[in-house]
Amino acid sequence: MQEMVGYLIKYPNVLREVMEGNACLLGVDKDQSECIINGFKGLEIYSMLDWKY
């Protein structure tokens, strides 16, 4: 799962699509996918995916 999180950080456009429900994470089950998405939502990411400090 750590590799998937790293990939989503590297490619924020993919993260955006996954969070909007327009894409899914291959090889990741629904529970893991929801966990990853909720983790990013918990970081208070702006709509342009700039990190909020």
UniProtKB/Swiss-Prot annotation:
InterPro entries, sorted: Competence_ComX_Bacillus
Residues with a covalently attached lipid (3'-geranyl-2',N2-cyclotryptophan): 51
Sorted UniProt keywords: Competence, Lipoprotein, Pheromone, Prenylation, Secreted
GO molecular function: pheromone activity
GO aspect biological process, one term: establishment of competence for transformation
Propeptide: 1-46
GO terms under cellular component: extracellular region
Domain of life: Bacteria
Main location: secreted
Pfam families, sorted: ComX
Post-translational modification, as annotated: Trp-51 is modified by geranylation, which is essential for activity. Modified by the tryptophan prenyltransferase ComQ before export to the extracellular environment. The type of isoprenyl derivative differs among the different pherotypes and depends on ComX primary sequence.
Record's subcellular location: Secreted
Other remarks on this protein: The DNA sequences encoding ComQ, ComX and the N-terminal two-thirds of ComP show a striking polymorphism, which determines the specificity of the quorum-sensing system in the different pherotypes of Bacillus. In ComX, the sole conserved residue is the modified tryptophan essential for the activity.
Subunit structure: Interacts directly with the sensor histidine kinase ComP and stimulates its activity.
The protein's role, per its UniProt record: Part of a major quorum-sensing system that regulates the development of genetic competence. Acts through the activation of the two-component regulatory system ComP/ComA composed of a sensor histidine kinase, ComP, and a response regulator, ComA.
Protein name as catalogued: ComX pheromone
Organism the protein comes from: Bacillus mojavensis
